[in-house]
């Protein structure tokens, strides 16, 4: 009789311990899910900011291209004025050849590799029988399975986000290099054009 009582007490203790572990495990999966959802939100915000930054860089590069176009017109006008005034020196050819590097490497385009939009798809990670080994086989373990499935899907999305961010950052770094080259080229051409114009006005 005493042995039966001891066994019942031991079984009750085991059941209580199993319930405690189930509660702790459930809370753990809830925290995991909350953390990966916060990471996903941060990733989405980062992608949006990168996209906005890409648009700003595109506008800046378009401005550099427009300045280049305007400078071609200004240099042509200075050439015509130089011929009219009898000035033979024509550094425009030299300027154009020196600027060719800056203006000849835009083949990849500003938005050549925009990041692919992240699709909220869950990667199929479920194993037959679920993610956990059943002990209590109740609603808590069902929720644990669901939480872990969502965690797995979000982690898959985070991986895609990281790849998209890396691609976009690489694209923007190349674009920033182009913008710097074009800005240097434009500044040089503007300075030289100003010197020529000043010389013409002084000689007149």
Swiss-Prot record:
It holds the Pfam family SNAP-25. Its main location: other. Coiled coil: none annotated. It comes from the Eukaryota. It is found in: Synapse, Synaptosome; Cell membrane. Transmembrane segments: none annotated. One of its GO terms (biological process) is synaptic vesicle priming. Expressed in several regions throughout the adult brain, including the mesencephalon. InterPro entries: SNAP-25_dom, SNAP-25_N_SNARE_chord, T_SNARE_dom. Keywords: Cell membrane, Coiled coil, Membrane, Repeat, Synapse, Synaptosome. Residues 1-25 are annotated as: Disordered. Residues 1-11 have a biased composition (Basic and acidic residues). The keyword NADP does not apply. GO terms for molecular function: SNAP receptor activity; syntaxin-1 binding; voltage-gated potassium channel activity. May play an important role in the synaptic function of specific neuronal systems. Associates with proteins involved in vesicle docking and membrane fusion. Belongs to the SNAP-25 family. This is Synaptosomal-associated protein 25-A. The lineage of its organism: Eukaryota, Metazoa, Chordata, Craniata, Vertebrata. The gene is snap25a.
